[in-house]
């Protein structure tokens, strides 16, 4: 009697089922073995994202020592020094567009929180607004300008003072370039009116320490002068003497070094004039 052969299609079906069953068992074993480490890594990533995107900002903002007087009716100034928007030429990493996006986003979030916490009436930009200002093309400048306006968006009622830096118009490793000075003045327009803030008794002057040029932002008959300069004037004795002889400022705001420093120059005449 001839034995009935085993159907080939049935054999293949059983083989496939066996393979699927073994694969399912293998995945279960893998999941059982790696489940806890995987959950830990995913949780760690989630915590990192939440911390970097929200908790770190909240924590830092609560640590800011911003003091307001009782029934505060003073004028609040917010100083933005050396934001240096990432450019299009020197950033040669594999993904420069991602770098620009991330840096812009970091600046935007920080500025929004600082603006809200300070209740600023005036925002002063102390130069180096763009990192590649002296070498970028017209198209690159226009792109950077659009990014700048998006990052540092503020109410129309907020007054603005713009001071140029060496990355904007030159001056540190090259001469100050007149064309760049003109471009800066055309696109970054100061909208400062001291009278509307009750500061009409003060003089406000911008000093370009790289070429000695001065720009009067607000002029009054008073001898009390506030100076804005990108380069730290107090670090250069001869320059400081010239500025004191010419303007005799009671207060100087500078940037450039990316470090917060306070210098006190006691002036009896200045104190007696209040």
Language model: regions and residue ranges:
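Residue-level marker for buried hydrophobic side chains located in beta-strands
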Residues: 77-79, 125, 162-163, 227, ...
């Amino acid at each position: 009697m001839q034995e009935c052969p085993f159907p080939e299609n049935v054999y293949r079906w059983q083989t496939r089922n066996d393979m699927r069953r073994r694969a399912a068992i293998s995945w279960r074993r893998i999941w059982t073995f790696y489940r806890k480490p995987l959950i830990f890594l995913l949780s760690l990533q989630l915590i990192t994202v939440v911390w970097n995107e929200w908790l770190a900002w909240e924590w830092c903002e609560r640590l800011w020592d911003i003091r307001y007087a009782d029934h505060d009716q003073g004028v609040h100034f917010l100083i933005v020094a050396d934001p240096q928007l990432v450019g299009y030429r020197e950033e040669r990493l594999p993904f420069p567009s991602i770098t620009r996006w991330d840096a812009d986003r970091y600046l935007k979030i920080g500025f929004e929180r600082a603006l809200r916490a300070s209740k600023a009436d005036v925002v002063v930009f102390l130069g180096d607004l763009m990192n590649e200002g002296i070498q970028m093309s017209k198209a690159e400048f226009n792109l950077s300008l659009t990014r700048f306006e998006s990052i540092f968006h503020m109410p129309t009622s907020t007054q603005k003072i713009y001071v140029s830096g060496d990355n904007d118009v030159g001056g540190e490793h090259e001469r100050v370039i007149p064309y760049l000075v003109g471009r800066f003045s055309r696109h970054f327009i100061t909208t400062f009116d001291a009278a509307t803030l009750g500061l009409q008794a003060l003089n406000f002057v911008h000093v370009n320490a790289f070429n000695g040029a001065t720009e009067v932002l607000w002029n009054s008959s008073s001898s009390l002068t506030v100076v804005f300069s990108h380069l730290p004037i107090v670090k250069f004795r001869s320059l400081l003497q010239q500025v004191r002889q010419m303007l005799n400022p009671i207060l100087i705001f500078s940037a450039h070094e990316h470090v917060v420093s306070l210098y006190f120059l006691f002036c009896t005449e200045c104190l007696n004039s209040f």
